[in-house]
Amino acid sequence: MPTVPTRRARPVILEMTFLRACVTLVVLLAGSAWCARSAAAAAPLPGLHVVGHQVLDDGGKPVILRGVNRAGTEYACVQGWGIFDGPSSDASARAIASWHINFVRVLLNEDCWLGINGIKPAYRGARYRQAIVDYVRRLHQHGIYTEISLIWAAPGRRRATNQPGAPDADHSPKMWASMAATFKNDPDTVLAPWGEPQVNAHCLLRGGSSCSTTSARTKPLYRTAGMQQAVNVMRAAGYAGPIAIPGISYANNLSQWLAYEPRDPLHQLIAEAHVYGKNTCSSVSCFDQTMAPVAQQVPLIFGETGETYDASSCGSSNISTFLHWADSHAVGYAAWTWDTWKNCHALISNYNGSPAHRYGAFLKRYLAGLVAPPPPGA
């Protein structure tokens, strides 16, 4: 994920009954047979669901998820000045939908969601969770599916001020159980237990003390949690919908995804890649070699994509290549980012939806071009 700026001083969603006794038990027994039995007993909701390599809607029709990331909820709270960076109103959701978007990736901060490690009371715990739930509801009311993705976390008493290399064993399992309990009755939301791994495929799957990684700024070693545990925890907490599992190398490498796919008794996994210009895998030949085979087995989404990962270009040549390849392979995508930052990552210049740069203008035009014109006389 690109760096973010600092700032100076349709479904019914259940608000979480935080850390019930059963959820605590889920975390403690995440790898046990009890979890597997509980997950197997769950029945998929009649909303977004996976069949083979496709995502289907509640009517059984294939859905290609096309949209944007909405950054802010991962950093504003821990920086101490808000929950969102920009509005979260109904009007702002309507502006997103006006681009013919059907998918928004909403990003989470572990400390803010769990209410730990000294986050300001106004931006943590129940207030933070309810703000996310309310925003997701507004998006749904405008026909937009969502992905709820944990991306900023930290072990122990360290604050989640960045995106480290892997989820932490201290808090992430509790976070996953809480996310699942909150959204288990929302059939139009995908859950994503992690954003951009910086560990190898075995460590991403299994976690553990032998997979310790370092936090980007303070460099402490910490015990990691793996994607198999994430699937176990979410299923045992009652969530039966799709779970998006990233590739390695900042989610840019899917070459080992199928070999290290977590076991899901409900068979509701989505593969997630992040693709930017200047990434190691950012060419059609690389996509054909490493991503197309995955897309033939499970649904694939470019959970983040943009012109360049370092905001060095406001153009559209790379993003055009990425989206055309994705649409030719029934792969979804979410462009980075629906925010008004003063750099080339910003898709918009204001939250009414005015595009910024050639990059934003291209995406708006491209999505509009995918909408079939009405028949004559309609």
What are these model-predicted stretches?
Residues L45, V51, A131, Y135, ...:
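Structured catalytic cores of enzymes that bind and process phosphorylated ligands/cofactors
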Residues G31-P44, A378:
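Polybasic, low-complexity, intrinsically disordered segments
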Residues A21-A33:
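Bacterial N-terminal signal peptides
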Residues A39-F103, A122, Y366-G369:
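N-terminal carbohydrate-binding accessory modules
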Residues G47, D85, N109, Q163-V190, ...:
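Extracellular glycoside hydrolase catalytic/binding regions
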Residues D85-A154, S172, R223, M234-R235, ...:
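Aromatic-lined substrate-binding rim segments of carbohydrate-active enzymes
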